[in-house]
Amino acid sequence: MLERGCLRRVLFCDEGILSMETAIFEPGGYRYIRGPFQYSGGVAAEPGFSIERVRFRTPLAIEDGFLRIEAHLKKMGLPLTSFCACELRSPAPFTEEGFINFNRSYVGTLERWGIFRDDENPVARSNVCPAVGPPLEPSFQAFSYTVPVAKCDGSFVIAGSAEAPEGQGNYNARIIRLGDQSSEAMREKALYVLCVMENRMAALGKTWTNSTATTVYTVYDFHTFFEDEIVIRGAVNNGLTWVYARPPVEGLDFEMDVRGVLTELII
C-alpha cells in the first residue's frame, strides 16, 4: 500500500452531500483528493512545498510532452514524483470507451515515474478539446509540480470537472440535461460544476479567495447567468478565462478548473 495518510470530510452543496477523501502523496510533497484511476480531484502543496505551473508555447503530443516535463524536472533538480497536475488538449471529444483506453495509456508513464500505483492516481488533470485549431493528437498544454520552499504559500490546483457526477453507469446516464444547451440547461450544468469546484477546494481547505485563476471550457453561451451564478460567488475575483473548447467526453458541455499558483512560466 502507498504511504499516504487519509482524511475524510463530508461536504455540502446544492446537489446534496459529497464525500471527498484526501490523502498525502509524500514523495511529491502534496496532498490530493482521491478520485478515479485517471486523475485526482485536486492537489495542494504540503508544508515546505509550493506548486509551480509551466505552460508550453505550443502544445506537445503526450509522448513528447512527458519527455519535456521529465527534462524540466531534472534540470530543476526535482524528482519525477513532484509532478502533480497537468492540462491536456485533445482533437475531439472521446467516446466513453475511447476515453478509458486513452487514460490507461496516459497513466502508464505515471506508473513508471513512481506516481501511479494500485489504480491510485494523485495527479490532478483537465483535458479539453479546442473547437478551433485543435491538436492532431492528445497533447500537453501545461503542467504543475512541487518545489521545496522555506514557507508554504498555500498553492493548489483543482482538476477539471464537467456536468457528470462521478459514480456508476455510463456518462450518458449521468450527464446533467444531456443534449440540452438551452439557457436554463446550461445554468443547471454550470451550477453543478461550480458546486464541484467549491467542494474540492473545501476538501483542501481553500476557497475562491485563495484562487489566482478560474477557467471555463465551453462552446455555449453562459453570459445569461455569468453574473448571477459565477461572479456573485467570488469565482472571478482575478478575472475569468473562457477557453472555447469542449469537455473530453461526447455529450458534455461545460467544464471548469481553478488554481491558486503564484509562480507560472512559459517554455
PLM features per residue range, with description:
Residues 2-4:
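Extreme N-terminal basic, low-complexity initiation segments
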